[in-house]
């Protein structure tokens, strides 16, 4: 719920206080404006989007953030990130999350995190339902995000498994 409220999900209403991000009051901003400002939410149950490829989704989101992206550079970085997550290249051409296992959906979310490099990443139970190997790979992707980018992470979890693998300031 916290992640959805921070991202401005329409089904939740803030009844008091403010949501400040980078010194700006975003309490009444739309979800897309929050995303453009640098916020990212990894869903506990990622949606399936038939007809929109994983690659197309990430490239479109990246272009919304930074403008034109050279296709060669994009493909090279996408391949690098997918390799870190041990995702077969064919996943890039598949419809977003359609037919993906739970672990594959989580990897796709972390792939988005690695490619979009948001200022604030809210990971909502990213490790939920994952086996030890999948948690290790997801954690590796989160570590890569931290290494490559000076962004903040808000990790919402019922387990400490992912926390054991990432660098953190406050727990």
Short names for language-model regions:
Residues 117:
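Conserved catalytic motifs of ABC-family nucleotide-binding domains
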Residues 18-34, 97:
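ABC ATPase NBD Q-loop/coupling interface
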Residues 113-114:
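ABC ATPase C-loop
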Residues 125-126, 133:
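Walker B catalytic motif
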Residues 45, 51-65, 77:
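Q-loop/switch helix immediately C-terminal to the Walker
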């Amino acid at each position: 719920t916290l992640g959805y409220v921070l991202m401005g999900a329409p089904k939740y209403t803030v009844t008091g206080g403010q949501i400040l991000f980078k010194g700006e009051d975003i309490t009444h901003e739309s979800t897309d404006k929050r995303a453009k400002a640098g916020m990212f939410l990894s869903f506990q149950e990622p949606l399936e989007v038939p007809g929109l490829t994983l690659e197309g989704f990430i490239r479109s989101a990246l272009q919304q953030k930074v403008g034109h992206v050279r296709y060669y550079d994009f493909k090279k970085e996408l391949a690098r990130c997918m390799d870190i997550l041990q995702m077969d290249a064919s996943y890039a051409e598949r419809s977003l999350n359609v037919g993906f296992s739970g672990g594959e959906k989580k990897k796709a979310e972390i792939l988005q995190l690695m490619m979009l490099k948001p200022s604030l990443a809210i990971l909502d139970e990213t490790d939920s339902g994952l086996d030890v190997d999948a948690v290790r790979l997801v954690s590796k992707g989160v570590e890569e995000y931290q290494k490559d980018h000076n962004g903040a992470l808000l990790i919402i979890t019922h387990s400490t498994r992912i926390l054991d693998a990432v660098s953190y300031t406050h727990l």
